[in-house]
């Protein structure tokens, strides 16, 4: 049984008197212990999907789905209070810009201890004294912070961005989640720090069997760490496949464009040569094209593309394109 099963998730915003679809019929199934990647440009709806899973909705949002189940529990039928309780016990989220997510006026140790739920205590009643501090030290060691004394008495601005993100991961692990959502956890970090964070998440997945949803705009990075990747464009899923298969044999032109945009430092490039990017820009939600949303930018677009393509293909490799690429190799 899948841990998270989403079918035809749609998220709409109310702008004035009209509703605008920001996410359109996105489906996703995550199994226990899986690392799933979610990739797309800024504005493709990646963070909105994560917030919809956690139930963090605004008043001008309308979230609908044919199915949204977490471990055989229908999230759509739960009240707001029941949803918060379920998510608080089973789901954690890591946000972008960790320093802005921490309270600048509180020491890191106090913030970490405040986020350790009482129900996670498993010892005897006479051992409860100081257990949150011991648990906080254990979590800091678990995420790779060896000098816990210095980290716990520091304020967030006294730590590096990488250390703050490790603290945020420790806070996310405090409730022992079954699903960890990482929304661009290494955005604007140095490559060495990025590798440390992703190695840490992979180790947590292997040791605790924690399911991880990795959200990023970097396809090259996701292909190294995720088991399977969903590619989003303008709020729609355009391709889903195992990581290696997606990178070596993409079927959708947008996926191919993301792969070609990855710089190749192994070969020399002519001076002032153009990068392999798609022409144009991602359309506004209020001005979406008819049919395939990539149509105006797609180099392979034809007359049939005015009809919205359905997600089709094999069980492990789905694509939404009338003229898929690399089909002769299968």
Curated annotation (Swiss-Prot):
UniProt: ATP binding residues: 40-47
Record flagged with keyword Cell membrane: yes
Annotated phenotype, changing residue 183 to E: About 60% stimulation of K(+) uptake by TrkH
Annotated ranges, domain ABC transporter: 6-259
Subcellular location: Cell inner membrane
Disruption phenotype: Single mutation, decreased extracellular putrescine, in an sapBCDF operon deletion no change in resistance to antimicrobial peptide LL-37.
Record's GO cellular component terms: ATP-binding cassette (ABC) transporter complex, substrate-binding subunit-containing; membrane
CDD domains per the UniProt record, alphabetical: ABC_NikE_OppD_transporters
InterPro entries: AAA+_ATPase (IPR003593), ABC_Ni/Peptide_Import (IPR050388), ABC_transporter-like_ATP-bd (IPR003439), Oligopep_ABC_C (IPR013563), P-loop_NTPase (IPR027417)
Phenotype when changing residue 183 to K/N: 15% to 20% stimulation of K(+) uptake by TrkH
Keywords: ATP-binding, Cell inner membrane, Cell membrane, Ion transport, Membrane, Nucleotide-binding, Potassium, Potassium transport, Transport
Record bears the keyword Ion transport: yes
GO MF, one example: ATP binding
Major location (coarse): membrane
Membrane topology of the entry: Peripheral membrane protein
Family in the record: Belongs to the ABC transporter superfamily.
Record's function text: Part of a putrescine export transport system, does not play a role in resistance to antimicrobial peptides. Stimulates K(+)-uptake proteins TrkG and TrkH to import K(+), may act via ATP-binding rather than ATP hydrolysis.
Name under which the protein is recorded: Putrescine export system ATP-binding protein SapD
């Amino acid at each position: 049984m899948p841990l998270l099963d989403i079918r035809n998730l749609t998220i709409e915003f109310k702008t004035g008197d009209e509703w605008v679809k920001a996410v359109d019929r996105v489906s996703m199934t995550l199994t226990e212990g899986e690392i799933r990647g979610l990739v797309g440009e800024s504005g493709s709806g990646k963070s909105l999907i994560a917030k919809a899973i956690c139930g963090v909705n605004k008043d001008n949002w309308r979230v609908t789905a044919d199915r949204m189940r977490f471990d055989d529990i229908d999230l759509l039928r739960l009240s707001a209070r029941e949803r918060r309780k379920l998510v608080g016990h089973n789901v954690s989220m890591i946000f972008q810009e960790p320093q802005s997510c921490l309270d600048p006026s509180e020491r890191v140790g106090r913030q970490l201890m405040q986020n350790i739920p009482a129900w996670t205590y498993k010892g005897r009643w006479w051992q409860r004294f100081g257990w949150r501090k011991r648990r906080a030290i254990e979590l800091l060691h678990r995420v790779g912070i060896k000098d816990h004394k210095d980290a716990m008495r520091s304020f967030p601005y006294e730590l590096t961005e990488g250390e703050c993100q490790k603290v945020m991961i420790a806070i996310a692990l405090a409730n022992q989640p079954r699903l960890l959502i990482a929304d661009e956890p290494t955005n604007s970090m140095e490559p060495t720090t990025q590798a440390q964070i992703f190695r840490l998440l992979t180790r947590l997945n292997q040791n605790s069997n924690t399911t991880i949803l990795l959200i990023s705009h970097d396809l090259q990075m996701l292909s190294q760490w995720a088991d399977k990747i969903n590619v989003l464009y303008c709020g729609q899923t355009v391709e889903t496949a195992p990581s290696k298969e997606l990178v070596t044999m993409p079927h959708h032109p947008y996926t191919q464009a993301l792969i070609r945009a990855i710089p190749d430092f192994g070969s020399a490039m002519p001076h002032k040569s153009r990068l392999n990017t798609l022409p144009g820009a991602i359309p506004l939600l209020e001005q979406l094209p008819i049919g395939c949303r990539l149509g105006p930018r797609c180099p392979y677009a034809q007359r049939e593309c005015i009809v919205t393509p359905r997600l089709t293909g094999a069980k492990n490799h789905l694509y939404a394109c009338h003229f898929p690429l690399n089909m002769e190799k299968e």
